Amino acid sequence: MGNMTRWLFLLLCLLPFAASAAPPLERTVAVTFDDLPFASVPTEDDGYLEDMTARLLHSLQAEHVPAVGFVNEAKLTRDGILDAGRVGLLRVWLQAGFELGNHTFSHLSLNRVPLAEFEADLLQGETVTLPLMQREGKTLRWFRHPFLHQGTTPEVRAAFRDFLTAHGYVVAPVTVNSPEWVFAAAYARAQAQGDEDAARRIGAAYVPYMQTVFAQAEQLALDLFGRPIAHVLVLHANSLNADHFDALADMLRQRGYRFVTLDDALRDPAYAAPLGASGAEGESWLEGWARQAGLRPPLPPPVPGFVTQWAGTAALRGY
């Protein structure tokens, strides 16, 4: 199928959905955090983790952001034993009014392990979170693919979609993805080494970088849909966001964004289109839609060299 044919096909697919619901005329974004209870921190000391979580949640509440946090339950253990303090961090999220989702137990890639192994890991990943949610009167319903990997074949992707439906899960998409974890790894390393100047430089570079990321996503959405779409942003529960989410939220408001729930974002007709992330690439939904329409999504903006240097080997690892 040629590029023009793909593009026409995409438009024809989207027209019925665009006609069935009014598209958002303003910029909206749902915010999600992966790898709870924590990722990229200078220390795993209980006191620090409690303080970091409190600061992050305080920023979310102060900015009126209805976030969802996605849990890797392997991180609830210490030396293979369930750690009450780390479980307590999830309770803090729930008691602050936020929702939790399943990010698998051990952050496996569906592109790299057999489907049955991945499904078992997902179910193991609800052992603690599910009863915690139930005690708060909430339903565990959101699932986020680690690495955004959805399987390398149509058969695996279809079988896993059926598995999710059978277990009451809804996939949480991502349209704004970035190497935020590189900044976070660099920031945590600078903090761990007591280099306050480096941590300040890294933190100061973070929000301007994310502004460029959003500009790219906004343009790609316009190229595909001819309008703004309700975006879904993925971040991580780390010390960088605990210290700088308020500045990130301020930047987004200056760009005209209103924060919405994940449910609200998925009401955008764009998400009803019969296209999604290509799976094997681990791309955002927006990039997947573009590639399937015969377009080449832009590369992420380059991370500043000093940030990459501070991140070290973490800069080579994806989340």
Q: Whereabouts are the PLM-identified features?
A:
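Bacterial N-terminal signal peptides
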Residues: 7-16
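Short, basic, helix/turn surface patches
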Residues: 94-102, 128-135, 196-214, 283-303, ...
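Sec/Tat signal peptide C-region and signal peptidase I cleavage site
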Residues: 17-21
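Glycine-enriched alpha-helix->loop->beta-strand junction motifs that scaffold or abut catalytic
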Residues: 96-97, 165-170
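Active-site beta->alpha N-cap acidic-glycine motif
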Residues: 22-148, 233, 251
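C-terminal domain-boundary segment and adjacent tail
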Residues: 64-67, 173, 227, 237-319
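Positively charged n-region of N-terminal signal peptides that target proteins for export
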Residues: 1-7
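Alpha-helical scaffold elements lining the catalytic groove of polysaccharide deacetylases
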Residues: 82, 108-134, 153-167, 175-227, ...
